[in-house]
Amino acid sequence: SRGLGDVYERQGLEDHRVQFTPDVMPADILGFNMYQKNTGEFVYYPGTIMCNLFLADEINRTSPKTQSALLEVMEEGRVTVDGVSREVPKPFIVMATQNPKGSAGTQLLPESQLDRFMICMSMGYPDLESEIAIAKGKSTAAGFGELRAVLQAQQLVDVQAQVENVYVHDSIYAYITNLMNKTRNSNYIELGVSPRGTIACVRMAKAWAFLQGREYVIPSDVTDIFMDIAKHRIVPNTKARVAHVTEEAILSQIIADTRQPASYMEKVD
């Protein structure tokens, strides 16, 4: 998180980090109106969400009420306080960390909240060489000073627009939809991926194709990111839990059972 903040500052962007403890209130995130005696008016004081990069650290330690404060802004890019809506700056990104399920003092994130995160990744433990480097102090805060920005704010917005223009063939749309439908009809899944997850898969596949230097999406772009966009959106049922079948195993089988399209590059103008 420290490294991300430094990079954003070098890009001329604003980042805010909030430690989500149980006493954090929605107003701390969204902002609040305060009455000014001298003018007789209410003045809006922006919350920490008014930034380009918002990092919610240990998001599952705070109350469900505070967690839900992020629902509107993550979906619509705006906050509403006392009936007045305000746009957040662009570009706008929300990132969060959470403690393992069952850890002391944690609250489970509701499905509606999880669904708004495009991807979910587990950092896990570092490999042996990386941990040795950490032990030697080679991956400390001092190294963040060497980070440099390769894009400025407007350039980042322009790149996002380019990603939106990446071509997706109808057969790829059908392939993605088939994958999502199979999560909803699996014998091991109680709650499958929502239509919002389908949209996230398309957008993430476009971004992955763009990073590979392509202007069109191929099936492997979808399979490469499918696990990261779907794993946090499905809820295994009792049968899966009793059989100790993991989310990864379920989704891997769905990928294996879904036929990939043979044609996906013919662009129709």
What are these regions (language model features)?
Residues 10-37:
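AAA+/P-loop NTPase substrate/partner-engagement loops
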Residues 185-269:
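C-terminal engagement/docking regions of AAA+ P-loop ATPases
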